[in-house]
Structure formats: structure tokens, C-alpha cells
A protein has these predicted regions:
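Alpha/propeptide regions of enzymes that mature by internal proteolysis
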Residues: 2-301
Length: 301
């Protein structure tokens, strides 16, 4: 009969080394996730922690407090989470709450629903103890006032970097999360792909996961993240799956889309990859506790 000490050693040997891939250059996100994983926390806990770190950073204008507002000067936030069991939660058009990713987690864990929006999402958040907070910082307000002078339409490539993260934990389970302030100076009420399961994020623990950033309207049209995962199910590796999903968009625009979309993906084996339409796409990968900033060149660059 094996000793308890040997049994514990066997468990450690059977554990996987966690893997993290996050859109853009959000080092605080990966660092927060690593802290959770170092304590053998779940991929879902790590993904939530990653997004919370970005949401709490006032100097970041892309998510949480300090996000650039809509055309009316109001900060509206979107987020979603999906775990290794296929459970998911989402909030959209949420105002005055710093951590929409945690509200999305509460929707998943504490309700029978998947998505809450607007005033209903805010009421739910407050009922769960989240505090009403002014999200419009001095910097984001000044940027909005400057934009007001000419009201030139901005593009997501100019102003908007969604934080999306995909994580595989020590048990081999994959979860993901997205959080964003959305398209800067958008129409009041606009919601993009980030809170939509299958568009901004999708996880199938038997296959892998994918997430998106860029022009959300175009990601929604193609159910982008779901498509990437389905391509991996068919045998594509993460990079090839992201590339094929983008090639379908390129084809639908006669080879010349005038916007940016980027995908990240992770396979059940812990392999990660990314691809983008234009320019370049920075992203962070953490393996064996070491985080490296990577960049891929756009397919049309």
C-alpha cells in the first residue's frame, strides 16, 4: 500500500503546468493570475483575478475605472466569464461598477441566467455588495471633452483594447474571461462582442478556448470565438484555427476588410496561439511562471 507521502508526490507529478494567454500588453493581468495559480487556484478564479487587475488600474482606459466613455460622457462596461464546465455569466451596459467581471461571475454562480444588462445588471451588482463608483476619471473626462470639439469617429483600433484571458490550470481545466469599456465615444447603449458567449469568448474544456478583441460588430457576425474552438475540434492547432477564422472574414470582404480583429486561442494540450487581420497584435503568454510579450503580424500586413 503506497504511503500518503508518495500519494501526494504522485498528485504533484500528475499536475499540469498552468498556461495563460492574454490579449494585448496587460502584465498586471497575467501577474494576478499567476498568484492564484501558484496557490493551486482554479482557472476560473485566475481568469477573474486577471481581469480585475486591469479593471482596477485607473491609468488603463480600456476596462473598469478610467475607461473612455460613450458619446454622452458615460462609462458603460461589458464583461463575461466561462468556466471549464460550460457555465457562463455575462453583463453588458453596466454603469458605476468597477469590476464587471466579478458581477458576471456572480451571474454565473448565483443565478439561473447567463446575461444581465443595464439597470438590471446594476441592481443585481448592488444587491451582491458591489459599490456604486464614479468610473469617469480626470484623464478619461479630459479625453472625452477634447473629442467633443470635433466628434471625429474613433475606431476600436484607435482607442480600445479588450482584456481577454484564457487560462489552463494545474488540473488541465480551461476557463476564460473578457472585460472592456467598449468602443470609445460609442453611441449610448452600444454593446460589442466582449460580453457575448460565442463571440468574444468561448470555452469547451474537451477542445480548448478562444477569445477576441477588435471591432466587436464583425466578431459577432461570425461568432468568432466559437468558430475558432470548432476549428480546433476539427484538428486545427490554435494558430491555424485563429488564422482560418480570420480568412473567412477576409473572404467576405473581398480580401480587404478595413478594420482590425484579433483572436487568441488555447488547446486542451496547453498549446496557445494568436492571429490578427492587420498591423500587429501584442499578447502575453505565461508558461512555467514566466511571462513573455509576443506579437504576431497581421495577415494583411
Amino acid at each position: 500500500m503506497p504511503s500518503l507521502k508518495n500519494a501526494k508526490s504522485d498528485v504533484k507529478r500528475n499536475k499540469k503546468k498552468p498556461v495563460i494567454i492574454t490579449t494585448h500588453n496587460f502584465p498586471k493581468a497575467n501577474a494576478a493570475a499567476v498568484k492564484v495559480l501558484n496557490k493551486y487556484g482554479s482557472s476560473m478564479d485566475a481568469a477573474e483575478a486577471a481581469c480585475m487587475a486591469v479593471e482596477a488600474d485607473e491609468k488603463n482606459s480600456n476596462a473598469g475605472i478610467g475607461s473612455l466613455p460613450d458619446e454622452n460622457g458615460r462609462v458603460t462596461l461589458d464583461s463575461c466569464v466561462m468556466d471549464s464546465n460550460g457555465n457562463c455569466g455575462s453583463v453588458a451596459f453596466l454603469q458605476n461598477i468597477v469590476h464587471p467581471v466579478s458581477v458576471a461571475r456572480k451571474v454565473m454562480d448565483d443565478t439561473k441566467h447567463v446575461m444581465l444588462v443595464g439597470k438590471g445588471a446594476k441592481k443585481f451588482a448592488v444587491s451582491k455588495g458591489f459599490r456604486h463608483t464614479n468610473l469617469l476619471t480626470k484623464d478619461s473626462r479630459n479625453a472625452w471633452m477634447k473629442w467633443q470639439k470635433n466628434r471625429v469617429e474613433m475606431t476600436p483600433h484607435d482607442t480600445h483594447d479588450t482584456c481577454a484571458t484564457l487560462i489552463q490550470d494545474h488540473n488541465g481545466n480551461i476557463s476564460g474571461a473578457c472585460t472592456t469599456g467598449g468602443w470609445a465615444y460609442k453611441m449610448h447603449g452600444r454593446v460589442g462582442d466582449s460580453p457575448l458567449i460565442g463571440s468574444g469568448l468561448f470555452i469547451d474544456n474537451n477542445v480548448g478556448g478562444a477569445a477576441a478583441t477588435g471591432l466587436g460588430e464583425e466578431v459577432i457576425k461570425s461568432s468568432g470565438s466559437f468558430l475558432v474552438v470548432e476549428l480546433m475540434r476539427q484538428g486545427y492547432d490554435p494558430v491555424s484555427a485563429c488564422t482560418e477564422a480570420l480568412n473567412r472574414i477576409i473572404s467576405s470582404y473581398n480580401g480587404n476588410p478595413d478594420f482590425q480583429i484579433c483572436y487568441i486561442a488555447i488547446s486542451k494540450d496547453g498549446e496557445v496561439g494568436a492571429a490578427c487581420l492587420k498591423w500587429s497584435f501584442p499578447h502575453l503568454i505565461t508558461k512555467s511562471g514566466i511571462t513573455k510579450l509576443k506579437s504576431v503580424k497581421g495577415l494583411l500586413s
